[in-house]
Amino acid sequence: MEKEKDKKPLFGGIFQKFFKPSAKAEAKKKKEHHLTVQRSIPYLEMGRDGICRVEEHLYSKTVRFYDINYQLAQNEDKNTIFESWCDFLNYFDSSIRFQLSFINHKSDMSEYNKVIQIEPQHDQFDDVRMEYAQMLKQQLAKGNNGLVRTKYITFSIEAKSVKEAKPRLERIETDILNNFKVLGVKAYPLNGVERLQIMYEMFHQEEERKFEFSYDRILQSGMTTKDFIAPTSFLFKSGKDFQMGDTIGAVSYLNILAPELTDKVLAEFLDMDKNLVVSIHVQSVDQLKAIKLIKGKITDLDRMKIEEQKKAVRSGYDMEIIPSDLATYGGEAKKILDDLQSRNERMFLITVLFLNAAKTKQELDSAVFQTAGIAQKFNCTLNRLDYMQEQGLMSSLPLANNLVPIKRALTTTSTAIFVPFTTQELFMEGDSLYYGLNAVSNNMIMADRKQLKNPNGLILGTPGSGKSFSAKREMTNVFFTTTDDIIIADPEGEYYPLVEALGGQVIHVSSTSRDYINPMDINLNYADDDNPLGMKSDFILSLCELIMGARDGMEPEEKSVIDRCLPLVYQKYLNDPKPENMPILGDLYDCLREQKERQAQRIATALEIYVNGSLRVFNHQTNVELDNRLICFDIKELGKQLKKLGMLIVQDQVWNRVTINRNAKKNTRYYIDEFHLLLKEEQTAAYSVEIWKRFRKWGGIPTGITQNIKDLLASREIENIFENSDFIYMLNQASGDRQILAKQLNISPFQLSYVTNSNEGEGLLFYGNTIIPFKDKFDTSLKLYGLMTTKPNEIAKYREKKDA
């Protein structure tokens, strides 16, 4: 059962059509016999700037607009969008005709394939590389059979010349773009070439030949713009369909019979997986004329009511017994009059046309039948334009010139029920990566985090929801399609199979390991200015603070002592930056021992176990390959005493790498699994906050992977991590976390259903200001799946297979 708020009443009956002449009479009214295909196309000139002279004194422009999330929005947000759309419609006065065009057409899949294309590199990774490439192609094929959905608004005005029309059209265009901006809708005006391409694609729906045109060719060849877009032929022999080139088509109009419609009606039509053009022609009626018309109808109804009452009296019946239609129409007319006079409503004349096209008559009839079925679902009918197929086809072109004389009178609210927004898509070019399929449209999601204001990201989900798997899939995609470096902090030892398979370096950090990383490592690009030691000092202070277990931080005297020692410790390296001159923790310890202050001795004593004692794993020169493109710091075996220290040192190593890569103009991706472990300690949490603040400027892209959003809201400082993340990949969420996310990201209850008891690999993607539900069912038979899975039984099977 439809919710009351999702439906808007329509007025019908005697107001349904202003006129509909006889079809055959209309066919005979053609003023001239078109001898060529070009003369059938109803415009005179198309300018480079997108201004089209449609008729002698009629000029038009077109704006393309994109989708926003309407169907998945909260009811409150839906109402806001609907009211803004009503205001949008009310902007148009009676001097402006406008046409909304919604075009579903088969796309050139080669353009999409270019975005997901992964070329073989003829190296040892080609087997998994091409396996991943094939998976992407299969996922692309699942999305809407290669259909592209585009949306346009075309507006036209009458003017004596293009000189007079141009400034007015540009002013209207600016207002339309601003009105779209209020709605949060991206839009841009089309130039002449883009407008011609739309018409070319409408005339050649079943052809693969691309549109080739330039205005320079017109000057060279003496041809007209119509020569470049026209099909080989038009045949309007039948009254119910037509032939254009190798395509057969039919145009129908929507006969609105329902007393009320839902805001889902247009979305249902646009969800069809067939070629379809929906055109809604709208003409505003002058307000005074509209009120005068309604008052005239009310007068006519009152006169008819009086006549019926007289008949009733003469026949001996109660004069209150009159035909029910009269009472209905009378009440309806008075309500419309009230809306026009006091509720900011206008009256519009609208024509809704549907252009179906196919290769064969059978396919066409099937498409028309499917379209008619959707209309019937909403208590409307889809009627063929008998003997007006040519007018219907030409009215479907985005020229804002309606040649079909069948119109329906609707108020603003009733017109706005054809909400042109459904759900957003995300398919970007550039270094875009695969994030699953849109759960609503089934279209592929390809997004480039580098294009976000803040590319920082979070992957959130309950255990078993697919967090680590999603992170590994992104890493794999990054490895195959970019030159970015990838660094992983792995507290659970889950990533090494994938890292080793991709030729990466796994660094096992533990008290018994022979892999060493030096916390004193520094490079000359460590800071923005020429003083790398200044920023390194912050890290050393955090390190010592953690070692000393100072809950309230170190005393100022202790910080001063360390700050005094650091230039002495690094002097040899800064004078001669050779690897063998890099200091180690023991050098800092020795320097502190030489200081006279008791604070220095206290710090040195705290450092002693990490320099000469059982925890001296971090008192060595780095002996592992840190210039590998893919590095995983496996800290699973670090004991409780070293775990926090190890995670802080790993973060500093990442910062070292980021600073080196910045000079090389290279991005660095940093993945932190079990991110909540870092947020529990003040020092590592503070360092993480700094990473989220500073990384973007240095070309770093950090991603935190954790279970609970609550950990990210533990303090105002840590909350900055959440606020500075424009990419959030949400898998299944616990109840408490769902409510927090809904509040923080303005997620609707319907959207929340995608992270409520959802299957593995399903959830919501927050990208900038866009929220898209996704699903990602990864083929378990692929070799890559065995490298990426975290399920113990599947890992065991993979190892057995590998050892066999």
What are these regions (language model features)?
Residues 2-421:
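Extended, folded cores of ATP/NTP-driven motor/assembly subunits in large transport
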